[in-house]
Design a protein with these regions (language model features):
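Intrinsically disordered, low-complexity regions enriched in acidic/Ser/Thr/Pro/Gln residues
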Residues: 1-63, 70, 77
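A glycine-rich, hydrophobic loop/mini-helix early in the fold
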Residues: 50-103, 112
Length: 117
């Protein structure tokens, strides 16, 4: 039996005041306090020069297969302002998940806080 794709339209949002407080805490300290249970792989690193030092927001997560960005296209319409789009594609680095048009749409139209690929 195939599981198929699942898209959840509702999610519980964190308190905005708590999210704002995370802008003052280094990510490494947060990971240490949480027993590193929510830490990302160290191969994930900054590849741009953001105007702000901290990228903080509720995560909008997307899991897809290598070479398949259908769930990512759905996320383009579902994520909102201030969200951090977190995309997993089974660690495939042979194909691009998104290009300049999608990035510009997320940044300027959707006004998300950032993207983690």
């Amino acid at each position: 039996m195939s599981v198929g794709k699942r898209i959840y339209l509702k999610r519980e949002m964190p308190d905005p005041e708590i999210m704002a407080q995370f802008k003052t805490i280094p990510a490494s300290n947060t990971a240490d306090v949480m027993n590193r249970s929510c830490a990302m792989n160290p191969r994930i690193h900054l590849v741009s020069s953001p105007k702000e030092q901290m990228m903080v927001g509720p995560a909008y997560t997307v899991k897809g297969r290598a070479g398949d960005n259908l769930t990512l296209h759905a996320a383009l319409n579902l994520c909102g302002e201030g969200d951090v789009l977190v995309v997993s594609n089974e660690e495939d680095n042979t194909r691009a998940l998104m290009g300049e048009v999608m990035m510009a749409y997320l940044r300027y139209t959707k006004k998300i806080a950032g993207i983690i690929l």
